[in-house]
Amino acid sequence: LVEQITTVVKDQGMPIEMLSMIELDIKEELLMKHPERALGQLEKLQQLGLRITLDNFGSGRSSIAWLQRFPLTGVKLDRRLVKEIGEQKADEVLGAALSLIQALGYTTIAEGVETQQQLDFLKQKGCDSGLGYLLMNPIPENEIVSVLHQRDEQRA
């Protein structure tokens, strides 16, 4: 993977420094399949400047020991955890997971935010950002560039 990314960057004539603008999402199940091998690859990707986010956290067999060793910048909480917000036990578990991720210094992103109750809970617990239909509908591929331009114009 490291070689493939490096090759694409060189082939496109992209300055290597631009890699710091790219965030790579890696699924939890992939990292936990061979964590030792994954750690070595993640360290190389980090050295290239890539930001690395663990995707689908809570959907598989995460290990706190590995979570603290991986050179991550963020963790995306699986939508199944977010869906259960409002149930006391689920709220406690999700709150604890957010506290743990934040204690490790990673940004937190919640996937599948579809209700105001979910958004309010996540804000209260200090979740950094969210993804879901409540916040924005999926954008068709052919409209992405114009939506990004509009967003940039609104920020200016």
Language-model features: where?
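EAL-family c-di-GMP phosphodiesterase catalytic domain
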Residues: 3, 21-34, 48-156
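A short, hydrophobic coiled-coil helix within the histidine kinase transmitter core
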Residues: 4-8
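Conserved hydrophobic residues forming the short capping helix/wall of the S-adenosyl-L-methionine
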Residues: 9-13, 101
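Short helix-capping segments at alpha-helix termini
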Residues: 12-19, 48
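Conserved functional hotspot residues or short segments at active or partner-binding sites
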Residues: 41
